[in-house]
């Protein structure tokens, strides 16, 4: 059995694909197979894959219609033969000894290994280290010891969910899949893996280099950002399944506060579509939330008000005015109270 199956979803990355494949095929640890899932590319990516496959028998190409990264990774899992599975993005690259270093953990048969990611810009310059990708809080908590969810429960949902930051035992993820046709699917996959795992290691080294193709401050807000609601509902279901419902406060914060911040940051031209999607998702989730004791009895009143505004408003302007009027009312009451206490 091959030791590591490397799964690479590929979609229109002709500019970056060679660097990605070179970093995998030249690894100092070579007991690997490389599963490239061509996810309906329309550029020269398929030709690049064929050229590399002709020169390296470890490369397997699977082609499908465009279904997104989650579906492509699932196909990779189903075709993997390795003892461990690694998910890589096709516009990034690995350090040359990444798998050799990770192999040092595998005698203990961990469910998965986590490690640090370095970010870089288009011009090749290194971005400042980001705690989300370097996880210093995880290092200080677990060090070099094996851990599980219970050891990190207070910040479990703030761990890095990026697939390239983890190496999974294939048998361990045999019943875990990425949600398909939706953004932020890696949140659900990682959360289920974290809740299920009993033997996790953190390797405090940079092994992977993640490309930042566009500054987030210039990225237009997409209606797909509202996928956060459906994804968070899936995580709420996992919390219930694994009896980890202590995360509800944080998850409802994402559903309401974070979603409204996305809406407020959007250009006015985007707000009608964003509002329609928010309202659609809130209505679709209403029976689930209204039967949840936390939502009914403990939810922040501001979030409950926002929910009601979305359900009752007929357009985005009514929604924004409804929510903002509540915020203004709170500020007015706070200022009055502060004057009385002065």
Report the location of each language-model feature:
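Catalytic core of nucleotide-sugar-dependent glycosyltransferases
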Residues: 207-214, 219-246, 258-289
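Short, well-formed alpha-helical segments that are part of the catalytic scaffolds
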Residues: 12-26
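Glycine-rich, basic loop-to-helix element that forms the pyrophosphate-binding segment
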Residues: 64-80
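Donor-binding/catalytic cores of nucleotide-activated saccharide
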Residues: 69, 90-201, 211-222
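Membrane-interface aromatic/basic loop that binds lipid-linked glycans or pyrophosphate carriers
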Residues: 268-342
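Cell-envelope/extracellular polymer assembly enzymes that use nucleotide-activated donors
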Residues: 2-5, 23, 33, 188
